Amino acid sequence: MTKYEYVWLDGYQPEPFLRSKVKVTNDQTPPEWSFDGSSTLQADGGSSDCILTPVQEYTNPLFGDKLVMCGVQTGSREVHPSNTRHAASEVASDEWWFGFEQEYFLTNPDGTILGLEAGIPSKPQGDYFWG
């Protein structure tokens, strides 16, 4: 038995939320799975079936089960408008590289930035790159 936690973005705007649901199965790979899209703003109440299509599977570092990142399709198997992963895959290639930048400041006990003179206001963003 394998426990799969399906993870997808809902239809909330302007910023979607992460949604998930769990399926325990004997399948070796995560199967497609339907859900009620009316509760995630991805379908009207009259025709609310949506389909989760597995895109990538990862081992859950906390529990050892599987996390399944999913795209969303409508009940008629069209790409759902909230499925921005699909739109990105159409313009991206395997050649693309990207990175994330996280900035840190060392501070004095009083909260001022270490290395700046006391009483002098800090400069706008961008002038603190010391590496």
Can you describe what each PLM-predicted range is?
Residues M1-G131:
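Glycine-rich, acidic/polar active-site loops that bind/position phosphate-bearing ligands
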